[in-house]
C-alpha cells in the first residue's frame, strides 16, 4: 500500500470509539522513515497531528538506572534470564507510561523487544478503547506470516499470527 492509503485507512480506524486498537505498518527501515515523515504531516479525524514516533529501545534503556544497567551488562553473558526479565519489566513500564500519557502512540525501534523475546500480548491488551498503538516494524508478509528483520537470514522473527488483526496490518509498497 502507499503511505497515503495507509494513513487514510488508519485515520478512519482511529475514529472508531471502542475495541482493539493495535495497528502495524511493515516495511524496510528507509520506507518506515519516509512513512514516519508523512505521518507527522497528516492530521487525525479530530484535526490533531499524529504523534512523533517513540523509540522503544531508548525508552527501555532510559528506564533502567545507570548503575543497574552496568550490572546487567556485566552479568548478561553468565546469567541472561535476569537481564531478559529486567528488560521485560522496563518494556511494560515504558509502554504503560507512554500510552497513559498520550492515548495514541507510534512505536518504532523495537529491536530489544524481539532480541529478548519479550511478551507482546501487553501491546494487544493495552491497545483498547481510548488507547491506540501504531507499530512501525521492519518486516514483510511472506506466505501468510509476518517476518520481521527479513534481511537477518535465520535470525528473523515471526510476529504471532493473532497479535494484530489482518485488517490492522499494512505493508508499504515496494
Question: Residue locations for each model-derived region?
Answer:
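Glycine-rich P-loop/Walker A and Walker A-like loops and their local beta1-loop-alpha1 context
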Residues: 1-47, 118
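Residue-level preference for the first positions of well-ordered beta-strands
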Residues: 20-24, 102-106, 132-134
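Conserved beta-strand scaffold positions in the cores of enzyme catalytic domains, especially
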Residues: 22-24, 50-55, 156, 166-171
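Short beta-alpha junction loops
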Residues: 28-30, 59-61, 137-144
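Structural alpha-beta junctions
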Residues: 41-52, 125-134
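AAA+/P-loop NTPase substrate/partner-engagement loops
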Residues: 48-71
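Conserved nucleotide-sensing/catalytic segment adjacent to the nucleotide-binding pocket
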Residues: 64-105, 109, 116-125
Amino acid at each position: 500500500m502507499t503511505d497515503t492509503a495507509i494513513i487514510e485507512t488508519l485515520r478512519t480506524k482511529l475514529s472508531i470509539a471502542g475495541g482493539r486498537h493495535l495497528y502495524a505498518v511493515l516495511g524496510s527501515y528507509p520506507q518506515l522513515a519516509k512513512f514516519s515523515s508523512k505521518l507527522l504531516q497528516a492530521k487525525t479525524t479530530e484535526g490533531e497531528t499524529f504523534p512523533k514516533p517513540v523509540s522503544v529501545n531508548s525508552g527501555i534503556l532510559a528506564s533502567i538506572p545507570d548503575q543497574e544497567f552496568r550490572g546487567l551488562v556485566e552479568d548478561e553473558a553468565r546469567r541472561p534470564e535476569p537481564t531478559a526479565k529486567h528488560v521485560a519489566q522496563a518494556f511494560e513500564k515504558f509502554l504503560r507510561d507512554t500510552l497513559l500519557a498520550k492515548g495514541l502512540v507510534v512505536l518504532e525501534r523495537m529491536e530489544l523487544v524481539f532480541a529478548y523475546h519479550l511478551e507482546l500480548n501487553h501491546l494487544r491488551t493495552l491497545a483498547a478503547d481510548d488507547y491506540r498503538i501504531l507499530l512501525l516494524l521492519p518486516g514483510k508478509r511472506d506466505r501468510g506470516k509476518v517476518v520481521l528483520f527479513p534481511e537477518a537470514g535465520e535470525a528473523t522473527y515471526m510476529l504471532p499470527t493473532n497479535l494484530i488483526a489482518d485488517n490492522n496490518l499494512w505493508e508499504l509498497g515496494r
